[in-house]
């Protein structure tokens, strides 16, 4: 199901209509020349009959909180090794930059 149906339905609710019909949602979508699949829209409207939009949003947020991020904490030892390696690489890069600067100034300066 496309989010356009959800958005149009919620726009109707925000406009003061707690239970918008298929026709009203079609009018909202028609205002922006969106394609409407009648079967999908009818199924969506039927699934929301008798339900409050605010309750659905609250229930959905609770479900999202239970899902979690799916990211596990990295071991602290691995992070320390990575930072030490990064510091070594930074020092090498700094030395290379200093050498390049010294090579650039070989007395061939036009203005100094």
From Swiss-Prot:
<keyword id="KW-0687">Ribonucleoprotein</keyword>
<dbReference type="GO" id="GO:0022625">
    <property type="term" value="C:cytosolic large ribosomal subunit"/>
</dbReference>
<comment type="function">
    <text>Plays an important role in the elongation step of protein synthesis.</text>
</comment>
<feature type="compositionally biased region" description="Basic and acidic residues">
    <location>
        <begin position="84"/>
        <end position="95"/>
    </location>
</feature>
<comment type="subunit">
    <text>P1 and P2 exist as dimers at the large ribosomal subunit.</text>
</comment>
<dbReference type="GO" id="GO:0003735">
    <property type="term" value="F:structural constituent of ribosome"/>
</dbReference>
<dbReference type="InterPro" id="IPR044076">
    <property type="entry name" value="Ribosomal_P2"/>
</dbReference>
<protein>
    <recommendedName>
        <fullName>Large ribosomal subunit protein P2</fullName>
    </recommendedName>
</protein>
<feature type="compositionally biased region" description="Acidic residues">
    <location>
        <begin position="96"/>
        <end position="106"/>
    </location>
</feature>
<dbReference type="Pfam" id="PF00428">
    <property type="entry name" value="Ribosomal_60s"/>
</dbReference>
<dbReference type="InterPro" id="IPR038716">
    <property type="entry name" value="P1/P2_N_sf"/>
</dbReference>
<keyword id="KW-0689">Ribosomal protein</keyword>
<dbReference type="GO" id="GO:0002182">
    <property type="term" value="P:cytoplasmic translational elongation"/>
</dbReference>
<comment type="similarity">
    <text>Belongs to the eukaryotic ribosomal protein P1/P2 family.</text>
</comment>
<dbReference type="InterPro" id="IPR027534">
    <property type="entry name" value="Ribosomal_P1/P2"/>
</dbReference>
<feature type="region of interest" description="Disordered">
    <location>
        <begin position="81"/>
        <end position="112"/>
    </location>
</feature>
<keyword id="KW-0597">Phosphoprotein</keyword>
């Amino acid at each position: 199901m496309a989010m356009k149906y959800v958005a149009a339905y919620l726009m109707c609710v925000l406009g003061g209509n707690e239970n918008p019909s298929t026709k009203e949602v079609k009018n909202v979508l028609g205002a922006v020349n969106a394609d409407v699949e009648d079967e999908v829209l009818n199924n969506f409207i039927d699934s929301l009959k008798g339900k409050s939009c605010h309750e659905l949003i609250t229930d959905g947020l609770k479900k999202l909180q239970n899902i979690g991020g799916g990211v596990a904490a990295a071991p602290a030892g691995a992070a320390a090794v990575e930072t030490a390696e990064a510091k070594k690489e930074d020092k090498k890069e700094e030395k290379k930059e200093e050498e390049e600067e010294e090579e650039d100034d070989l007395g061939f300066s036009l203005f100094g």
